């Protein structure tokens, strides 16, 4: 006796509204993808970032804003902020210098250093940044922390002679964290060091200039700066040094 064959299972009917909704969503995704491809990759990275990834990386480490997040673009194409370990070490070296201090943050980026100083009690922080793509992030971080009464943004070239004059007054601590590209090419490095020496004009007889630089086995010795004593050299791994200079009276 031959086995009885099973009748084929009926296919489930798809609801017309669901089919239409699925198609419309797929069409919308394709249109958005096509629009995104027409935007240059460097700008696309900023506009269509991953908030979770970027926000998890940057935080205020201590002070009144401790653990508050700093918003930033993904990747290293626009900013290269110090890691939390390096930043914690640098601020540990300068412990006690920020209460009621005036701080100048050159190449401020999204405000990693300047806003940490504000959290530790700085009376005034001036953040110098020229990159229009980064300025929006910096201003949003200042607004998010609610410290706009003490932290200002100066739009300009940190290496230009007139920028320091526009900052106004004397500063107790100056952070100088140029893009690595400027520190690796001979002509641009000379400009950075000239600008670093000019910082002496906006500092009193006491304080610190903090300069970060990339290093490799072929790097020259840490530079001396006219008008400053030092540097005191702090190595972080094989590829980075933080140099501390003190104004020479």
Task: Specify the residue positions occupied by each region the protein language model found.
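Class I S-adenosyl-L-methionine-dependent methyltransferase catalytic core
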Residues: 2-249
